[in-house]
Design a protein with these regions (language model features):
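Lipid interaction determinants
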Residues: 18-140
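Bacterial Sec-dependent N-terminal signal peptides
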Residues: 1-29
Length: 140
């Protein structure tokens, strides 16, 4: 009987402990960065049409669509620092969307850090800590 009670108590502690670990892991900067974001501003200017960014923490890949062309590449992230490598892109021309195409490429090349607060991602330049881009995390 004592073994059964002891085993039950140990199992309870184990289950409760595992539950807490999941909460901590879910709030790490890497976990918060993972997912799809809809870009709201580039260099403090509202943008249209819709620009999407997706960060995949499993293989550190970034993917996006700037309104016309898809782009992708690799990123490295450590705490709040973020470095986006060279991006590959499709090369179509779309009236009205090319301004965003060029702007997003320039911004992502200059990112040095990020912050996520209340589901809003802000990318900052590496040198001046100036906000380059804001985006809202999509609900999954």
């Amino acid at each position: 009987m004592k073994k059964l009670i002891f085993t039950s108590i140990a199992l309870c502690f184990l289950i409760c402990g595992c539950n807490q670990t999941k909460k901590v892991v879910a709030d790490t900067p890497s976990a918060l960065l993972a997912g799809v974001f809809t870009v709201l501003t580039i260099n403090a200017e509202k943008i249209s049409p819709t620009v999407l960014l997706q960060f995949n923490k499993g293989d550190n890949k970034i993917w996006g669509n700037a309104g016309c062309n898809d782009f992708s590449g690799k990123y490295t992230q450590d705490a709040s620092s973020l470095n986006i490598g060279l991006l590959t892109s499709t090369k179509m021309y779309c009236d009205g969307a090319m301004k965003n195409e060029y702007a997003i490429q320039r911004v992502l090349k200059n990112v040095g850090s990020f912050d996520i607060s209340n589901g809003t991602l802000t990318l900052y330049s590496g040198t001046e800590k100036k906000p380059l881009l804001t985006a809202l995390k999509n609900k999954q």
